A protein has these predicted regions:
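Accessory helical-bundle/CTD segments and flexible terminal tails appended to RecA-like ATPase motors
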Residues: 1-186
């Protein structure tokens, strides 16, 4: 039961990655690094299928290689190049693969802002920040004061979001809009 609660808190993919790293550390005789999460980027969960379908790319080895390359991309340009390469090699991207790339872009932006987790579903969700995020604090205050029914702080590091987002396009637009709003002013 404790594990399922922890899994829900950080997201399944990140949870399994952290668990795997912890097991490797223990096997090597070291203590797991609890601050490791901050160095490996934001967890973005939009509750949408985000994958490379078997029907699009049947070879599991090639799919795994592409997943690793998407995960390793350090900027939007690298993601766009990879999209073009996949379209050239395998044809137009199915919806799930488009979601995968869009979430990878959101993850890059969220990581740069110091967001630990961005979770948006049908009814909204939350943003969890690292201890010292790179966001404009006034933008958070303006969101909460301007739309108190939709935004509120839930503890010192979580922004709770209450919005109807039943459509994937609405969810992506809301996520992009929030990340843009939170950008620090230059």
């Amino acid at each position: 039961e404790d594990q399922s609660g922890q899994m829900a808190e950080v997201g399944f993919s990140l949870y399994t990655e952290l668990l795997e790293r912890a097991v490797k550390s223990i096997k090597a005789g070291k203590l797991p690094d609890v601050d490791d999460i901050d160095r490996h980027g934001a967890d973005v969960e939009l509750h949408l299928p985000a994958l490379i379908p078997d029907a699009y790319l049947p070879d599991p080895h090639t799919r795994l290689t592409l997943y690793k390359r998407i995960s390793a991309a350090r900027d939007v340009a690298a993601l766009r190049e990879l999209q073009v390469e996949m379209i050239d090699r395998f044809g137009l991207l199915p919806e799930q693969a488009k979601h995968l790339f869009a979430i990878a872009e959101l993850k890059l932006d969220a990581t740069a802002l110091g967001i630990r987790k961005l979770d948006l579903g049908n009814k909204g969700g939350r943003i969890q920040f690292v201890e010292k995020p790179n966001v404009d604090p006034m933008s958070v205050i303006r969101l909460i004061q301007g739309q108190p029914k939709h935004y509120r702080m839930d503890g010192p590091d979580k922004l709770r979001i209450t919005l109807e987002l039943p459509d994937p396009a609405l969810r992506f637009n809301a996520a992009r809009g929030l990340l843009t709003t939170l950008q620090p002013t230059q």
